[in-house]
């Protein structure tokens, strides 16, 4: 078995449906991986009918249902124990892969490579800064938590957390990879162990990335393949987010910074508290909203998939727009004539960044997210 892909689902059945559809295409498109890949989905007690909805759609994938939400790290380790692959991919359910993403990443491994991550863009095509990160030392953490990184995004000092000085279009050896797409050699995980299960949510990817580095392996940011990561769907930035974020940062501080001076500890704790209060003050995550009683749509991509999508939208009283600029919903339809890779390239190269919606051939929904800190929207069709 070449690769095992582990996903954790929690009440995002339509987002993970689109994700699994793209994973299936990536496996089937690769001679290297066809019949040499396995997909394991651990469901953390979803209440949205995921475990009834998903298994019939993906009969070749393995679904494991938990009776309670055990947290991301523990569920990942649960999936890891079932893996038989030489490479393990930890993948978020709110992602869409290009058809060549898996093979490209596997081929990028050198003898000293421990893990590989990719260039990630949101649903509007904007590059996500967390695609490449440095170790969150004292100064880097403080500047990130207080928002200074946003003021100086290209600074090697103020934006050290996101390695802002590195060209996002080039490959780099980095400290920290994103858990949204983290491909790790299984033999490396045998040395480092999996995720630290004390992290219920957040920072577990930072911790594992750093342990891979400490074990003497390289973490590689690979710029030549891109994926979509909606991000907001798995990061609900409300009071609950603030609690788990604060909990994770306190654990991380204790694990890596407990020997620092009292003043340094005070700075880090203050920055964490500032971030928590900011999240609480901002309130619940924004939801994608629409301004027209009847929503106008514009379809691009595969003709066959688009025709089926158009039929379903008309049945739901959506209206076709006269032009793309007149549309409230710009929908990219994947299919034989338009791959996920070409769709990702289109939104990356678009001169104007705006929200898009996505539909995989044969799936039952459209998904999209207007903001990286907003919960996504699902239109069931």
Model-derived regions, located:
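A short, conserved alpha-helix in the catalytic core of glycosyltransferases
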Residues: 167-170, 175-225, 347
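Short aromatic/hydrophobic "clamp" motif used to bind/position activated sugar donors
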Residues: 88
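Conserved donor NDP-sugar-binding/catalytic core segment of glycosyltransferases
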Residues: 96-130
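Short, well-formed alpha-helical segments that are part of the catalytic scaffolds
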Residues: 7, 12-31, 307-314
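Active-site-adjacent helix/loop segment of glycosyltransferases
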Residues: 210-286
